[in-house]
Regions:
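Nucleic-acid substrate recognition interfaces
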Residues: 1-187
Length: 187
């Protein structure tokens, strides 16, 4: 290679997820149940307001989870980022429901049922989601939760978000989304 062709190039890597089993205490289970319920409630409230707004004006109103915190004060008890991610999920559901590339239009997104899978996603902001001593995972508004850390991420991987889910048998899992910081390599 000639010296004029050598240089640094920035490469961004893909995300990677690792799923861990977690063992919450009774208090943490109650907080998880509250968060699951609040996420479902906010999703259904926002969906209702969007449908009613569309039917009355022909346009979808811009709704946010904070609009409901005065009427439903218990929403302040749970992680605000989990509620913000509910808004993102609803936007994605509307994009998919009205995407013209599909052969048929499915109409409005469906409401979340209490029988549906319990899960929520929270973002990592300045270390709010972290693996501690290879025994615990710190989660916003929950605290340190005992976990089975069977696979470690490399040090150059940073936690981007975490999705907490409860299976039908009552077991809890956390899926940690990792993002590698961009690297500069010599080419």
């Amino acid at each position: 290679m000639s010296s004029s062709m050598c240089g640094l190039r920035e490469i961004k890597m893909a995300n990677k997820a690792i799923k861990y089993r977690i063992y919450p205490t009774t208090e943490q289970r109650i907080m998880f149940a509250k968060t699951f319920g609040c996420c479902r409630k906010v999703y259904n409230l926002m969906l209702t307001d969007k449908i009613e707004g569309y039917r009355s004006t022909g346009e979808f109103p811009n709704v946010t989870p904070t609009q409901y915190k005065d009427k439903y004060p218990y929403l302040k008890e749970v992680d605000s980022l989990a509620l913000a991610n509910v808004k993102m999920n609803l936007w994605a559901a509307f994009r998919h429901a009205f995407n013209k590339s599909y052969k048929k239009n499915n109409g409005f997104p469906k409401f979340k049922s209490r029988k549906a899978r319990n899960s929520y996603t929270t973002n990592n902001q300045r270390g709010t989601v972290a693996i501690i001593d290879d025994k615990y995972i710190r989660i916003p508004k929950i605290g340190k939760v005992k976990a089975v850390i069977h696979r470690k991420a490399n040090e150059d991987w940073k936690i981007k978000s975490a999705t907490i889910s409860q299976e039908r048998d009552g077991s809890y899992y956390i899926s940690v989304l990792l993002n590698m910081t961009s690297q500069k390599i010599l080419i």
